[in-house]
Amino acid sequence: MNLENVILSPVVTEKSQDLQTIGERMGKRTVKYTFKVHPDANKTLIKQALKQMYNVVPTNVNVAVYRGKMKRFRNMPSQRPHYKKAVVTFADGANLDFAKV
């Protein structure tokens, strides 16, 4: 798999913004960022892709797979796509420029 296709987009939600500042509040110098990643990506590929894109080595990667919800449109059932989300921990308060994604 090409490393440029591993990271799809950053996830910017209230919960992910709270994760970025939780390390400062607990007295640690760690920062957590959340990304939507390719469904076939594993933790090693995610680390390599982030190192290539941002020149920062992550200390920890946690991955979760989300199943698409069943929805109805005009009484016809359809399913939203499945996706994978990665919560990546960086040490020493690393700041990432999301314009590169």
Curated annotation (Swiss-Prot):
Residue stretches in coiled coil: none
A biological-process GO annotation: translation
Alphabetized UniProt keyword annotations: Ribonucleoprotein, Ribosomal protein, RNA-binding, rRNA-binding
GO molecular function annotation: rRNA binding; structural constituent of ribosome
Keyword match Ribonucleoprotein: yes
Gene3D superfamilies, per the entry: 3.30.70.330
Gene Ontology cellular component terms for the protein in this record: ribonucleoprotein complex; ribosome
Entry's family note: Belongs to the universal ribosomal protein uL23 family.
NCBIfam families associated with the record: PRK05738.2-4, PRK05738.3-5
Alphabetized HAMAP family for the sequence: Ribosomal_uL23_B
Protein role: One of the early assembly proteins it binds 23S rRNA. One of the proteins that surrounds the polypeptide exit tunnel on the outside of the ribosome. Forms the main docking site for trigger factor binding to the ribosome.
SUBUNIT field: Part of the 50S ribosomal subunit. Contacts protein L29, and trigger factor when it is bound to the ribosome.
UniProt protein name: Large ribosomal subunit protein uL23
Organism: Leptospira biflexa serovar Patoc (strain Patoc 1 / ATCC 23582 / Paris)
